[in-house]
Swiss-Prot record:
It comes from Eremothecium gossypii (strain ATCC 10895 / CBS 109.51 / FGSC 9923 / NRRL Y-1056) (Yeast). This is Geranylgeranyl pyrophosphate synthase. Mg(2+) 2 binds at residues 74, 78. InterPro entries: Isoprenoid_synthase_dom_sf, Polyprenyl_synt, Polyprenyl_synt_CS. PANTHER family: GERANYLGERANYL PYROPHOSPHATE SYNTHASE. Its EC number is 2.5.1.-, 2.5.1.1, 2.5.1.29, 2.5.1.10. Binds 2 Mg(2+) ions per subunit. Keywords: Carotenoid biosynthesis, Cytoplasm, Isoprene biosynthesis, Magnesium, Metal-binding, Protein transport, Transferase, Transport. Transmembrane segments: none annotated. Dimethylallyl diphosphate binds at residues 83, 168-169, 206, 223, 233. Mg(2+) 1 binds at residues 74, 78. GO terms for molecular function: (2E,6E)-farnesyl diphosphate synthase activity; dimethylallyltranstransferase activity; geranylgeranyl diphosphate synthase activity; metal ion binding. It is found in: Cytoplasm. It catalyses: isopentenyl diphosphate + dimethylallyl diphosphate = (2E)-geranyl diphosphate + diphosphate; isopentenyl diphosphate + (2E)-geranyl diphosphate = (2E,6E)-farnesyl diphosphate + diphosphate; isopentenyl diphosphate + (2E,6E)-farnesyl diphosphate = (2E,6E,10E)-geranylgeranyl diphosphate + diphosphate.
Length: 320
């Protein structure tokens, strides 16, 4: 009993080796090279905000931590076997451990807000926490809708899908911009926010990701060919294909519905779906055109005059 009382009266002890054990699923993924798109974007955004290198490094660490943790959860929710060319973390470490680690890393990232706030005389911790909570809620709202539609086989409209994406994918982009805006020195000035741009960027990024999932060989190597079909996901081109087939091709509609319900891993069947979206419904061409239109809209209306480097980043999203 003395030893128990000693534990109760002393500080809570957590060792470095225990921390390493807990982070194993996270480290499994974070050590695999990703696209680094968000890191590049933060550096480009900082051309408008003028944060210190120390602040930029902290924002980058926080956003990367949230992104990787969300991927751990995503892969469980989507039953994905692969991520970044290796077995998904839950395949290696199990779902319970991976879920716990991902949730833990959300809180670790939140603890970084205190370090960021301390780097400004005003110490805007309350503002940073508000941004963090709002955008994490938005992210989970979007993800929840995406899962609900998939699991109840509720085909969303294109408009509803884009609204969902603005929550799910736009959340981390908005969080990045809003945190950087809270940290910048001096008055904001009229029209100085990049939040509308980050909203559109989230949509552009997700629609492009949906397109590449069905067409890009590099994505096939990292996640498996047309992984969205195996997940039964209502991605942007698949929604368009279903809407087309429902009106113009009942047999094609039945085929698409059947394959999505099967959650098939059969490559031949998935290639038939992709061919249908390419040659019959025109969904891939439609999606590609929408990507180009979104990029043009962002560049012409939402990027400040001095944003040449940001324009280059947007252009990189339209090169297939």
């Amino acid at each position: 009993m003395d030893s128990v009382e000693g534990l109760a009266l002393g500080p809570v002890i957590w060792t470095a080796s225990q921390e390493e054990l807990l982070r194993q699923p996270y480290n499994h993924l974070v050590t695999q090279p990703g696209k680094n798109f968000r890191n590049t974007l933060i550096r480009v955004f900082n051309g408008f905000y003028g944060l210190s290198e120390r602040q930029v490094a902290a924002v980058t660490e926080l956003v990367e931590m949230l992104h990787v943790a969300s991927l751990l959860i995503d892969d469980i929710e989507d039953n994905s076997a692969w991520r970044r060319g290796v077995a998904a973390a839950h395949v290696v470490y199990g779902s319970p451990m991976t879920i716990n680690t991902a949730n833990y890393m959300y809180f670790v990232s939140m603890s970084l807000l205190g370090q960021l706030a301390a780097q400004r005389p005003a110490g805007p911790l309350q503002d940073l926490l508000k941004v963090f909570n709002e955008e994490m809620m938005n992210l989970h709202r979007g993800q929840g809708l995406d899962i609900y539609w998939r699991d109840t086989f509720t085909v969303p409209s294109e408009h509803d899908y884009l609204r969902m994406v603005m929550h799910k994918t736009g959340g981390l982009f908005r969080l990045t911009v809003r945190i950087m805006e809270a940290l910048r020195e001096g008055p904001d000035g009229p029209g100085s926010t990049l939040v509308p741009l980050s909203n559109l960027l989230g949509v552009l990024y997700q629609v492009r990701d949906d397109y590449l999932n069905l067409t890009d060989s590099r994505m096939s190597e990292n996640k498996g060919f047309a992984d969205d079909i195996t997940e039964g996901k209502f991605s942007y081109p698949i929604i368009h294909g279903l809407q087309y087939a429902r009106v113009h091709d009942p047999a094609g509609y039945d085929f698409l519905v059947s394959v999505l319900r099967q959650r098939t891993t059969d490559i031949t069947t998935k290639r038939r779906v992709v061919r249908y979206l390419a040659d019959v419904s025109g969904s891939l061409a439609y999606t590609k055109q929408r990507i180009i239109e979104l990029a043009t809209l962002i560049k012409t209306k939402y990027i400040p005059a001095s944003g040449t480097e940001l324009c280059n980043v947007i252009d990189s999203l339209t090169s297939f």
